[in-house]
């Protein structure tokens, strides 16, 4: 189970063929592999040793794929970083990981220079553009000046392949350690749930720096199908590419599907080739799922995962019953349990914490033994997500433990309230949080985003909620925003909403 073998296995099974289309240029699997070997040899010549950490901070491009495979072939460890992060977060990752090199773009060089201050481990800044910038190494020169033969290094399945830093929504980002076995097994198991047709072509819109995008890329090596790669998600550009290449599907996040429903941009393009999409990274509301499927006649298969599980835990299988609101069934080789506070299995249908076991589960957090001991116990990953399982083995995600709202002793699941808010025709996005209350302990506050041109009042929305919810589940406070704060892959940043509320109260 060696992640660096994926490209070679693809060539052995399917021969030389186009794997990626980027900016209308076709990249074959052989071309990507040879460039990965050149980069690996170049990194070794720079002094990168097995076990060293190398950061990759780029927008999506074939250079990211080459960089990942090249780093692994040099025996080093990939540190993917979302280019949208600020200098402080990048500095923390560079320092915590003790990275020896970073592969980035000239566009982010100023950010790297600020983040790099006082970090002694970082020896090389590699720039992907064909520019001669003092103090940097030219990525094109590394490829041009080194052999395309694979370095003779032994890589074991339990060697670290990636340290994936969490988004930091609950504090300082933690480095999730993932081995070759973790990621390879997850790619294989995920691929087993797919049934692509020979002519299927996908659109890759997810950041390759995120665990979801990383596994979609890894699983893609298991098939002979092409993928069109976008630097970053842009709705109009995505629609253009879907029409041009007759895209049959893409893996996305709920915010993307909601955007496609509420925007009129898709109306100007022929998107009839779409047949099946996948959703993950954040809960998909039933309203968004139904709205997307009705508008585009394309089904969405929702799944669930987290970085600590490499990341996929469950999905809807294409040939099985779909249950709206469910995150599907566990993927092959992955076990799940729903347990109470004493680690006892709860009865079917009852809520408890979702715990996971399998070859995909991380060995822990980098340099954080205390956090590792709390989250990984007796071979099980304690996700912190509250869920329930039905009689058919389908999982239903309820909420993060820390996001449950307790109003006068009643447990409120934010998603229940958000589903009702999404039913209102004027609302295109919504999130709720618990805010302190001296009498009830907590009260519910809703943040809503209205569709363009819509004019409704907080009382209108309260009335709508009272028609669908118990009184104690109806938001006491409603605030309008132009957009919800979301992570780069669409997760609602509830921490920022809590901070926003705290500032208003000051």
Protein language model regions, located:
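Conserved pre-ATP/AMP-binding loop-to-beta segment of ANL
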Residues: 16, 126-127, 146-165, 172, ...
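Conserved AMP-binding/adenylate-forming core of the ANL superfamily
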Residues: 8, 16-61, 65-69, 86-91, ...
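Conserved AMP-binding/adenylation subdomain of ANL enzymes
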Residues: 184-201, 209-248, 259, 263
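Conserved AMP-binding A3 loop
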Residues: 28-31, 161-185
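AMP-binding/adenylate-forming catalytic core of the ANL superfamily
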Residues: 41, 85, 102-104, 242, ...
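Structural core segment of the AMP-binding/adenylate-forming
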Residues: 25, 41, 45-46, 73-141, ...
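Gly/Ser/Thr-rich phosphate-binding loop
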Residues: 222, 247-252, 261-322, 335
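Conserved ATP/PPi-binding loop(s) of AMP-dependent carboxylate-activating enzymes
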Residues: 329-333, 344-375, 412
């Amino acid at each position: 189970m060696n992640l660096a073998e994926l490209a070679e296995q693809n060539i052995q099974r399917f021969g030389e063929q186009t794997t990626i289309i980027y900016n209308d240029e076709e990249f074959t699997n052989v071309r990507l592999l040879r460039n990965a070997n050149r980069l690996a040899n170049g990194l070794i010549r720079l002094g990168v040793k097995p076990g060293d950490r190398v950061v990759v901070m780029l927008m999506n491009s074939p250079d990211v794929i080459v960089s990942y495979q090249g780093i692994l072939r040099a025996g080093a460890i990939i540190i993917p970083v979302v280019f949208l992060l600020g200098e402080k977060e990048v500095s923390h990752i560079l320092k915590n990981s003790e990275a020896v090199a970073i592969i980035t773009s000239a566009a982010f060089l100023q950010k790297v220079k600020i983040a790099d201050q006082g970090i002694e481990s970082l020896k090389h800044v590699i720039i992907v553009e064909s520019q001669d910038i003092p103090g940097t190494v030219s990525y094109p020169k590394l490829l041009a000046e080194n052999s395309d033969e694979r370095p003779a290094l032994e890589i074991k399945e339990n060697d670290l392949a990636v340290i994936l830093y969490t988004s930091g929504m609950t504090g300082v980002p933690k480095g999730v350690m993932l081995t070759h076995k973790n990621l390879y097994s997850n790619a294989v198991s995920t691929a087993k749930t797919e049934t692509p047709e020979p002519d299927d072509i996908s659109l890759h819109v997810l950041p390759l720096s995120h665990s979801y995008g990383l596994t979609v890329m890894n699983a893609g090596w298991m098939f002979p199908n092409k993928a069109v790669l976008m630097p970053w998600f842009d709705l109009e550009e995505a629609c253009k590419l879907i029409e041009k290449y007759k895209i049959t599907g893409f893996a996305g996040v709920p915010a993307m599907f909601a955007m496609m429903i509420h925007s009129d941009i898709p109306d100007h393009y022929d998107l009839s080739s779409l047949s099946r999409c996948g959703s993950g990274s954040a809960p998909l509301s039933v309203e968004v799922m139904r709205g997307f499927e009705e508008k585009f006649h394309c089904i969405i298969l929702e799944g669930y995962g987290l970085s600590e599980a490499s990341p996929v835990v469950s999905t809807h299988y294409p040939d099985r019953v779909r249950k709206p609101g469910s995150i599907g069934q566990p993927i092959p080789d992955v076990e799940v349990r729903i347990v109470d506070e004493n680690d006892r299995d709860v009865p079917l249908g009852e809520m408890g914490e979702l715990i996971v076991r399998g070859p995909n589960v991380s060995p822990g957090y980098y340099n954080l033994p205390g956090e590792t001991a709390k989250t990984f116990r007796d071979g099980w990953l304690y996700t912190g997500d509250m869920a329930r399982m039905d009689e058919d083995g389908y999982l239903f995600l309820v909420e993060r433990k820390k996001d449950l709202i307790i109003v006068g002793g009643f447990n409120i699941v934010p998603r229940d309230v958000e589903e009702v808010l999404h039913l209102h025709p004027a609302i295109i996005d919504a999130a709720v949080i618990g805010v302190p209350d001296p009498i009830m302990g907590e009260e519910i506050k809703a943040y809503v985003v209205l569709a363009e041109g819509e004019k409704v009042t907080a009382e209108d929305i309260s009335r709508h909620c009272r028609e669908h919810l118990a009184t104690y589940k109806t938001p006491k406070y409603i605030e309008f925003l132009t957009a919800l704060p979301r992570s780069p892959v669409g997760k609602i940043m509830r921490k920022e909403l809590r901070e926003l509320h705290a500032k208003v109260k000051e």
